[in-house]
Amino acid sequence: KIIDQAKNSNVKEVFITGGEPFMLIDLDERLNLSTKIFPTTVLTNAMVFTGERRRRLENVDRNNLTLQISLDSATPDLHDLHRGQGSFDKALAGIKFAIESGFRVRVAATLGEDAGETESEWNALCDDLKLEQDQRVIRRIAKQGYANAGLVMSRASLIPEVCITKEGVYWHPVAAIDPSMKVQNDWSPLAETISTIKDEYRQHRIKGDVLASAFPCA
């Protein structure tokens, strides 16, 4: 239903995230529905590319699909600290499997602003994997969920990326468990939902411009 309405709502691309999307045993069917119409990206930790899920992944149409795989560092230390012991080796194996299987892969790291050396080592690993710059994403830590530090997010400070969950519509997927970022309960009709978010975003920008120009000194 979401994909059907997105066709007429000026949607340009679809991202599927979680949790872990590959825990859905029928994800391949959902992906094939989405990729027929939109460029589609799945955000995954690549840790469950085994058994039946691996077989189903191999049957997914590679056209219009990107697997965005989380890898926070070039060695297990930091990544495993974030995501659990042994997760680095599984993620790296998943990245290599996806590349070898002909999928477009983007690798994403969540790092603090002071992660200079870690970031350099991470980029070196991406070089070894022959990933281009547009196949690499570095996101800063947001003060959301279990994080006790990081960038503070609000609807006024964050460019919206409409996020639909079973609980409702959120301003952005990075804050999809934050009550203050929840826009409304129902996503349908999607075109109206997107219009509501655009209108609020415009108001935030107008207010920001007014504040920015309130004290001219030159």
Where in this protein do the model-derived segments appear?
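Accessory C-terminal segments flanking Radical SAM cores
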Residues: 141-218
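Short C-terminal domain-edge/linker segments immediately following a structured domain
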Residues: 45-47, 71-74, 96-104, 137-140, ...
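Conserved C-terminal portion of the radical SAM core fold
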Residues: 9-15, 37-41, 64-68, 86-148, ...
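Generic detector of well-ordered alpha-helical segments enriched in charged/polar residues
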Residues: 58, 76, 80, 119-123, ...
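A broadly tuned preference for mixed-charge, low-complexity surface segments
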Residues: 68-76, 91-100, 124, 156-166, ...
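A short, N-terminal amphipathic alpha-helix
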Residues: 2-9
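Canonical radical SAM enzyme core domain
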Residues: 1, 19-61, 71-77, 81, ...
